[in-house]
Amino acid sequence: MSPDPFFWYALVLKVAMTATIVVVVSVAAERSGPFIAALPTAASATYIILAVEHPPAFVAAAAIGSMAANAAVAIFALTYAALAQRHGIVLSIAVATLLWFGVAAVLRLVEWTAATALVLNAVVFAFTIPLSARYRDAAVPRNSVRRTRYDIPLRAAAAALVVAVVTTASHWIGSFASGVFAVFPIVLATFVVIVHPRAGGKAAAAVLAHVQPALVGLPLGFLGVHYLAGWIGVWWSFAAGLAITMAWSAVLWLVRRSRLRIA
């Protein structure tokens, strides 16, 4: 046990802040769908804490790790969607999670830059978005995924645990690894753990398949953080990065609405 009481105060603050962010976004996602659900909820909390505990250069470098690891999130979502068509939640989420960790481990073997991380995402999404298209048609019955009193607390607690571990370990694992683990898909994982048993694997897979296009906005947002953190400060860079990500989600939402009107 740490003898420093500040450690425990900081830990409680990390958990409380993360839980609050996840609760707010989860409620918003119920009304707005996967475009809001794909926003970096746990990652946002992680970066706020990293900004408090580390200099701007650390945050800027971590953003490259998050950009690269976003490709692993896309692979995670596709893997789960494919496996959930025929398999249960345990096998589907376990294999997808193990694959995420495998891709994350491989990412550490390369010296990534902002440009190469963007290229990686472009290549990965060129495959994951069209391959996920076949899984988007399954309907998600609203009554089968109606929120219970423990759904959001479960998601908030899981995300808070990941954020607390990553930010505490950031002092030892370095900036790139901190950025990689900041985008570990804990919010998506807990969502499908809740939905899969109630609505079925195909319905849960449809949600993650719809998330794929929205995930494209995350590396763009982290790109803004990377270049702006040292120039205008981390807090303004966070605002810019979030604005970029939300702008991308807004574009997708408008495109979707226009298609529905035409149909």
Model features per residue range: what roles?
Residues 57-68, 75-120:
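Membrane-interface helix-loop-helix junctions at boundaries between adjacent transmembrane segments
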Residues 5-18, 40-41, 55-73, 114-126, ...:
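Structural signature of hydrophobic alpha-helical transmembrane segments
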Residues 35-43, 87-99, 115-123, 143-157, ...:
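Cytoplasmic-side transmembrane-helix entry/capping segments in multi-pass membrane proteins
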Residues 21-33, 74-88, 131-143, 192-203, ...:
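C-terminal ends of transmembrane helices
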Residues 21, 72, 76, 80, ...:
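Alpha-helical transmembrane segments of multipass membrane proteins
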Residues 105-115, 160-171, 218-234:
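Hydrophobic alpha-helical transmembrane segments in multi-pass integral membrane proteins
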Residues 33, 136-176:
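Selected transmembrane alpha-helices and immediately adjacent juxtamembrane segments
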Residues 161-199, 205:
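Transmembrane helical segments that form the transport core of multi-pass membrane transport proteins
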